[in-house]
Amino acid sequence: MNRLPSSASALACSAHALNLIEKRTLDHEEMKALNREVIEYFKEHVNPGFLEYRKSVTAGGDYGAVEWQAGSLNTLVDTQGQEFIDCLGGFGIFNVGHRNPVVVSAVQNQLAKQPLHSQELLDPLRAMLAKTLAALTPGKLKYSFFCNSGTESVEAALKLAKAYQSPRGKFTFIATSGAFHGKSLGALSATAKSTFRKPFMPLLPGFRHVPFGNIEAMRTALNECKKTGDDVAAVILEPIQGEGGVILPPPGYLTAVRKLCDEFGALMILDEVQTGMGRTGKMFACEHENVQPDILCLAKALGGGVMPIGATIATEEVFSVLFDNPFLHTTTFGGNPLACAAALATINVLLEQNLLAQAEQKGDMLLDGFRQLAREYPDLVQEARGKGMLMAIEFVDNEIGYNFASEMFRQRVLVAGTLNNAKTIRIEPPLTLTIEQCELVIKAARKALAAMRVSVEEA
């Protein structure tokens, strides 16, 4: 039966939500009521599939905790007052922690003046952020296009590469197996997960995939494309595959890809949406090999966990294809003052507080602990790997991975799997995680694995 619109119902719902936003605490009955509401509304109006996913990785087999507020830079509190150490980091957005006071203050100050731009007058923060990124990024990267997400930043990179290379007769893109670049039509064409791709076939033509980390496969693909007249416009890849399971390429791989791109006249697009902003111990993961891309994609942590923002940064030579008509690729909300304020504050915090060095130090500490656990539990853990504060624990099968996430939830530590590799659990905490919290995470992982071994033995 068709449902008639109801202004009265919408007004009541919005008023109820506004009242909730104003609250700082909930009593027991309010907490129970909110939990029921959230579960019902997810089921009826968001997507019931999310409930089933949470049920599979949450202690007790229920639908999981309902988020309430940040407990500290590195913790979250649910509606029942339970505090969790965040080792998921919102899939990599909380590099400077939850509600970092510097970032929040910058956004609040800008909000008091002008939250969104007029579109007609020049907005100063967009200019200042573009200048800051030009100074921060490697090589000749100079001009920035701002958007709202990583997927959008990849879309902009693909369009920019097309606009630059089309007059040169180059239309093919090479991506890698296991890659994740987003789920919009263009980004999905570069992504390499059949589950995400098949329902939307056919995708954009001209995309080929080669094994990640295999430089000879990359050379062969570039050669074959040249022989058949399908010359390559760009190679797009992640320095470390995040959703693929935190897969690190062999040393020197990025350098070798850069040389191949130069040899064949292809642009190099690096997707640092997840690896950028200090996550791996460098501001950008490509800096571990001193590689300079033609186009760089950023998002996630760029907004400091406070505002969504993405950026596509390119060299002047490439970006100049948009000079004559800057309206060829635009977005209403991209580069808005609130998002730019958050990004500028985030960069300031990362540099001022030396969080890159902390990411390296604490990442080494955590990874050493996880590798020790892998040696102690070879029947459960296949490998622990990572760089900086981007780590993964790969289990012997998918079910054990789910069980580990559930057991960690019992220990009040949030973790989750990677989108392209279900048996791999990512460890991606804020770079602000304390040494004491690192020790607690390793202790929780040991307890979780011990409980899982008992369950396996009793089965």
Swiss-Prot record:
It catalyses: an alkane-alpha,omega-diamine + 2-oxoglutarate = an omega-aminoaldehyde + L-glutamate; putrescine + 2-oxoglutarate = 1-pyrroline + L-glutamate + H2O; cadaverine + 2-oxoglutarate = 5-aminopentanal + L-glutamate. The modification N6-(pyridoxal phosphate)lysine is found at K300. Keywords: Aminotransferase, Pyridoxal phosphate, Transferase. Its cofactor is pyridoxal 5'-phosphate. Disulfide bonds: none annotated. Coiled coil: none annotated. GO terms for biological process: L-lysine catabolic process; putrescine catabolic process. SUPFAM superfamilies: PLP-dependent transferases (SSF53383). It holds the Pfam family Aminotran_3. The keyword Transferase applies. Pyridoxal 5'-phosphate binds at G150, T151, Q274, T332. Pathway: Amine and polyamine degradation; putrescine degradation; 4-aminobutanal from putrescine (transaminase route): step 1/1. Its EC number is 2.6.1.82, 2.6.1.29. GO terms for molecular function: diamine transaminase activity; identical protein binding; putrescine--2-oxoglutarate transaminase activity; pyridoxal phosphate binding. Catalyzes the aminotransferase reaction from putrescine to 2-oxoglutarate, leading to glutamate and 4-aminobutanal, which spontaneously cyclizes to form 1-pyrroline. This is the first step in one of two pathways for putrescine degradation, where putrescine is converted into 4-aminobutanoate (gamma-aminobutyrate or GABA) via 4-aminobutanal. Also functions as a cadaverine transaminase in a a L-lysine degradation pathway to succinate that proceeds via cadaverine, glutarate and L-2-hydroxyglutarate. Belongs to the class-III pyridoxal-phosphate-dependent aminotransferase family. Putrescine aminotransferase subfamily. PANTHER family: AMINOTRANSFERASE CLASS III (PTHR11986), PUTRESCINE AMINOTRANSFERASE (PTHR11986:SF112). This is Putrescine aminotransferase.
